Amino acid sequence: MAAITASMVAELRAKTDAPMMECKKALTEAEGDLVKAEELLRVKLGTKAGKAASRVTAEGVIAAFINGNQGAMIEVNSETDFVSKNDSFIAMANAAAKLVAEQNPADVAALSALAYEQDGFGPTLEDVRKGLIGKIGENMSFRRFKRFDGTSLASYLHGSRIGVVVEFDGDATAAKDVAMHVAAMKPVSVTSADVPAELIEKERTVAAAKAAESGKPAEIVAKMVEGSVQKYLKEVSLADQVFVKAADGKQTVAQMLKAANTNVKGFTLYVVGEGIEKKVDDFAAEVAAQVAAAKAGA
């Protein structure tokens, strides 16, 4: 068997962008034949990535990049929380956020095509993603991102699972506090006037159904419904919420911002896996199915 040299490993890595250890294993299996090793490696990593690509990615991280008045936030998903803590996965997410801020891709496909190299993979971000899928054995995906430009920005990340970017004029410390508040209280808009009509209508429908059960006169029911809607609007609008750091427990975000001479133009809130239906494994059913299949084949 031919000796596996460092130069052979380096040559195979240059051709395939695969990790060095994978290159060495492939060369060993191919008994030093570079052509055969390259084929083995591409099949191995390609198959591994292909199997993972169909699996649900509901875990992951939120990454943000801010540079002056330019920035971006992105959600990058993985299958498990374990992989979301992987250094290579986190590095890819942070790099993706920076790429969004600096190069302004139109969508995920455009982002994926941008030049980027990491961990021996490249020359595009998509190649790095596929390489890490093959290396780690889990599906990964760039789910969504938003780019910010032309205004002051403040960001807050809570354990990498919740991310907030606030667009503002005024005091940076106050804006940072607002970002933290948004992460904790999850408002849906800056003011009650900005709450989406469909959310208001949904709340009105629920309130009407509850009020109707009271058996009170129609005019009283109407007032009850309106009262419930107004209460809801105060609960979900940033300006009307009680500031999480209020010393007296009463100061609203609007009052805090006025005192700080600061204006919040908007905010973006990302929560990892929000809206993604996670697969719940029923291990008892899986075992039962395997037993039944074994009996049928006997």
Swiss-Prot record:
UniProt superkingdom: Bacteria
Listed CDD domains: UBA_EF-Ts
Region of interest (Involved in Mg(2+) ion dislocation from EF-Tu), residue spans: 80-83
One GO MF term: translation elongation factor activity
Intracellular or extracellular location(s): Cytoplasm
SUPFAM superfamilies assigned to the protein according to its UniProt record, in alphabetical order: Elongation factor Ts (EF-Ts), dimerisation domain, UBA-like
InterPro entries (alphabetical): EF-Ts_dimer_sf (IPR036402), Transl_elong_EFTs/EF1B (IPR001816), Transl_elong_EFTs/EF1B_dimer (IPR014039), Transl_elong_Ts_CS (IPR018101), UBA-like_sf (IPR009060)
GO CC terms of this entry: cytoplasm
Keywords: Cytoplasm, Elongation factor, Protein biosynthesis
Family the entry assigns: Belongs to the EF-Ts family.
Function statement: Associates with the EF-Tu.GDP complex and induces the exchange of GDP to GTP. It remains bound to the aminoacyl-tRNA.EF-Tu.GTP complex up to the GTP hydrolysis stage on the ribosome.
Matches recorded under NCBIfam families: tsf
Protein name: Elongation factor Ts
Organism per entry: Delftia acidovorans (strain DSM 14801 / SPH-1)
Gene name per UniProt: tsf
